[in-house]
């Protein structure tokens, strides 16, 4: 499962380009689950810097499909956690 998170301090938001992409390609607004394939496709297509809003750079974390997860954040920098494990975005 792929999950979109904010990978810088500031907080999750989408750029106008990302909003337009989601509306034009899928006819939806940005209020979708972070694991929604359409949001994931948007970030993969545009890139995290373009898809992220003014104080946001977006990344994709991939976790096993059977994991119950949630997003935690510190000053807007997000990561995905399970009760006893966590995954962080790795810059490539």
Regions found by a protein language model. Give the residues of each.
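Catalytic phosphate/metal-binding cores of nucleic-acid and nucleotide-processing enzymes, i.e., regions
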Residues: 1-72, 76-92
């Amino acid at each position: 499962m792929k999950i979109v998170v904010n990978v810088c301090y500031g907080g999750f938001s989408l750029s106008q380009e990302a909003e337009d992409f989601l509306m034009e390609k899928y006819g939806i607004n940005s209020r979708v689950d972070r694991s929604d394939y359409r949001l994931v496709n948007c970030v993969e297509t545009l890139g995290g810097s373009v898809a992220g809003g003014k104080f946001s750079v977006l990344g994709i974390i991939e976790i096993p499909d059977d994991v119950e997860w949630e997003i935690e954040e510190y000053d807007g920098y997000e990561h995905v956690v399970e009760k006893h494990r966590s995954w962080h975005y790795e810059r490539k």
